[in-house]
Amino acid sequence: MYDQLQSIEDRYEELGELLSDPAVISDTKRFMELSKEEANTRETVEVYRRYKQVVEGISDAEELLSENLDAEMAEMAKEELSDLKKEKEVLEDRIKILLLPKDPNDDKNIIMEIRGAAGGDEAALFAGDLFNMYQKYAEAQGWKAEVLEANVTGIGGYKEVIMMISGDNVFSKLKYESGAHRVQRVPSTESQGRIHTSTATVVVMPEAEEVEIELADKDIRVDIYHASGAGGQHVNKTASAVRLTHLPTGIVVAMQDERSQLKNREKAMKVLRARVYDQIQQEAQSEYDANRKSAVGTGDRSERIRTYNFPQNRVTDHRIGLTIQKLDQILAGKLDEIIDALVLYDQTSKLEEMQNG
């Protein structure tokens, strides 16, 4: 482990030198790649450097205690030694987590699809609540959220909304959101005050770059048609809506939000590439899960992952048994408590899996 840490530190120092090299600075693509690599290793190096200081401090304190000290000095040295040993344990745990294999998709942007499922109008309204929640969370993180396609219902909900969220490490935080989200509340139209249960589904996919997945033109059928539905004045005037069908997988993506056929096609390609890439990832994950139990369910899209209970202001994440009485804050985009708990659970499970062989 320590040889690995030392090689990471050596590479970090090398990156520092490279990033001040005029030849690298003038090559924007390489400079960005190396900057990203440096940023990804910085925390590991900082923790390792502190660890080395602590180990040295323990050695010094033990050496000091082996000498003839007066009672007060001996007590101070013992106290310092005790504190340093505790810190060493904490740092060792952090190092183990930092050295866990990284999900190669963690630093990617995402495409998120939210759909009203069981529950009709109430499900569509809840899909809208989730959409707003993720938008607010993205804003708080300093990310950019862009709507690619929205199918709005007459009462202000969403049958379906697709958005792209861009920024630093988006997938690493939002990958746990895929699954069925259940809501329990009294609809505004319910005169008897009965609680209704509805469901919305969320799918989170890493954005796939062209270099990662190449979609051959011969494998894509393109259909152009007139926009319909809540498209406003340009409905049926121009054939701007685009439907792409990936023939090998049967995946279909339709876009009509933009007036421009070209823009709709660009957006549709983004979503299609992400869906095909995601299907490949899901198949690989299913194969892995068949041999080993996955820590936190990030794959099974039918899995009920969370319940939002309005009368009790309660949110429960069923995967980790976490219940929080702050539904109003969570729907306002304050998701950190849930996401941090999911990340920690996932990391702890992976550590246990590694230790158990």
UniProtKB/Swiss-Prot annotation:
* UniProt-annotated location(s): Cytoplasm
Keyword ATP-binding on entry? no
UniProt modified residues of type N5-methylglutamine: Q233
Which Gene3D superfamilies is this protein grouped with? Answer: 3.30.160.20, 3.30.70.1660, 6.10.140.1950
Question: Keywords assigned by UniProt?
Answer: Cytoplasm, Methylation, Protein biosynthesis
**Pfam families (UniProt xref):** PCRF (PF03462), RF-1 (PF00472)
UniProt record similarity statement: Belongs to the prokaryotic/mitochondrial release factor family.
Function noted in UniProt: Peptide chain release factor 1 directs the termination of translation in response to the peptide chain termination codons UAG and UAA.
Q: Return the protein name.
A: Peptide chain release factor 1
User: Gene name?
Assistant: prfA
